[in-house]
C-alpha cells in the first residue's frame, strides 16, 4: 500500500517554482548530504529546530525551537556527536543563532523579541540592549555577527539596520529601502558589505562598508524562489538564500546574479521541508535547520 504525506498549498506552489528553476545555469556550489541530527545526547527528539550556528573549532549549536532549548554538538571528520543541553528561563522560543569569535551564543527569541547573550558554557549573560539615537526600542527581526564580533540588527518596525560593536554601542544606522516588500534577514560578508533580503520580491540590497544607504544588488530571483527568508555568504563570496517555502537554497553571485539552486522538497535524508537557517564553516561544511522534518542536516559543499 502506498502512503502519501499531505502537502499544504504553499508547498505545491513552491514545487512549481523549483521546477521552473531546473533549467537554469550551472551552479557554483554543489551540496552533498553528510549526516543528519534527529536527537540529543539523551536520545530526546528535536522539535521544529529553526536555528543553527557553527564555527571552525567544530562546535555546532542548534536552536531546538519546539523544545525551547539549545543543543550543542561536536563535529569531526563528518560525524556529529551530541554534547550538552542548554535550557534557561530567559529563552522561550529560540529561533536564530550566531556564535561570536569566543564561542559565546547570541540567540533571537521570537516571542520575547529580544536577542539573548549566553557564554560558551550556556550561562545567560543578559539581553542585547541597543540605544540608537531617536529610537525608543529596537525590536529585532533578524541579526548577524561578523568576524570582529560586530552586531547587525534588522529592525523592520523602525525600517533600519543597526550596526553595533561588541560592547553594544551603535556605530552605524542604515535605513531600509522604501520601495520593497518585506525584509526578512540581514547578512554581512568578509569584506564588510551588508545585505538585506526582501522575501516577497526575492531581491537583495547591499551597502558597502561605510555606506549610508542600500542599493539594489542585481535583479529579482523570484522565478527561482518561492519565499526566501534567510541569507548568508560563504568564504568565496557566494550568497546563499534559504528558500523556506521552496525547500531549497538559491545561490547568488557577488553582483546578485543567479547562479543556481541546491536541494529540494522531501522527507528523506538530503531533502528539506520548510528549512529556516543555514550555517557554514571554513571547511565547506553546511548545516541546515530542517524545521518541519524535525532535524538538522549536514552537507559538504563543493565549488563547481
Regions found by a protein language model. Name each.
Residues 59-62, 104-107, 150-153, 193-196, ...:
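Conserved beta-propeller blade signature
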Amino acid at each position: 500500500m502506498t502512503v502519501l504525506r499531505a502537502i499544504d498549498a504553499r508547498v505545491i506552489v513552491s514545487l512549481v517554482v523549483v521546477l521552473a528553476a531546473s533549467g537554469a545555469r550551472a551552479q557554483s556550489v554543489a551540496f552533498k548530504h553528510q549526516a543528519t541530527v534527529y536527537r540529543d545526547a539523551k536520545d530526546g527528539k528535536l522539535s521544529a529546530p529553526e536555528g543553527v550556528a557553527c564555527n571552525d573549532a567544530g562546535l555546532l549549536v542548534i536552536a531546538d525551537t519546539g523544545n525551547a532549548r539549545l543543543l550543542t554538538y561536536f563535529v569531526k571528520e563528518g560525524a556529529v556527536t551530541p554534547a550538552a543541553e542548554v535550557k534557561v528561563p530567559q529563552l522561550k522560543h529560540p529561533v536564530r543563532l550566531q556564535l561570536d569569535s569566543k564561542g559565546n551564543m547570541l540567540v533571537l527569541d521570537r516571542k520575547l523579541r529580544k536577542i539573548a547573550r549566553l557564554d560558551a558554557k550556556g550561562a545567560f549573560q543578559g539581553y542585547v540592549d541597543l540605544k540608537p539615537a531617536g529610537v525608543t526600542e529596537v525590536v529585532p527581526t533578524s541579526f548577524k555577527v561578523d568576524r570582529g564580533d560586530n552586531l547587525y540588527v534588522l529592525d523592520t518596525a523602525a525600517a533600519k539596520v543597526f550596526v553595533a560593536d561588541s560592547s553594544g554601542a551603535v556605530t552605524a544606522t542604515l535605513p531600509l529601502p522604501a520601495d520593497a516588500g518585506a525584509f526578512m534577514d540581514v547578512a554581512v560578508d568578509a569584506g564588510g558589505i551588508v545585505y538585506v533580503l526582501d522575501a516577497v520580491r526575492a531581491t537583495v540590497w547591499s551597502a558597502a562598508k561605510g555606506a549610508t544607504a542600500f542599493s539594489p544588488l542585481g535583479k529579482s530571483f523570484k522565478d527561482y524562489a518561492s519565499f526566501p527568508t534567510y541569507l548568508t555568504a560563504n568564504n568565496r563570496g557566494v550568497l546563499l538564500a534559504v528558500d523556506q517555502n521552496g525547500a531549497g537554497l538559491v545561490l547568488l553571485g557577488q553582483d546578485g546574479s543567479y547562479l543556481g539552486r541546491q536541494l529540494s522538497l522531501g522527507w528523506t535524508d538530503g531533502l528539506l521541508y520548510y528549512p529556516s537557517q543555514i550555517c557554514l564553516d571554513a571547511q565547506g561544511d553546511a548545516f541546515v535547520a530542517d524545521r518541519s522534518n524535525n532535524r538538522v542536516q549536514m552537507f559538504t559543499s563543493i565549488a563547481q
